[in-house]
Amino acid sequence: MMFIDSHAHMLSRTTDDYEAMAAAGVVAVIEPAFWLGQPRTHVGTYIDYLASIVGFERFRAGQFGIRHYCTIGLNSKEANNEELAEGVMEILPRFALKEGVVAIGEIGYDEQTALEDKYFRL
């Protein structure tokens, strides 16, 4: 039987996890962009992060015969930093057309502010 893991944060997992997934029949994974546990304060950190999930992580999964897809977007916890949010919105198109990107967006609100609403509507 073949499986697709529709929500896995593989960037924070070891390569052993890909090996175990492949052995269990996982053939594809979708990795949603996520909050890294501390606020990103500069657009450069987003560029590094997005480059990792659309590039390196796709390569890493492929080493085990697993197709890696991802979603990208502005995290709700960081939407309230307007300078950062504007910068992220400017760079998202650079990553949106990369192979393996299947969606753009972020689900949910953090503090339900006007800034969060503004950036999620863009």
Report each predicted region and the residues it spans.
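Mid-domain alpha/beta scaffold segments of enzyme catalytic cores
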Residues: M1-L122
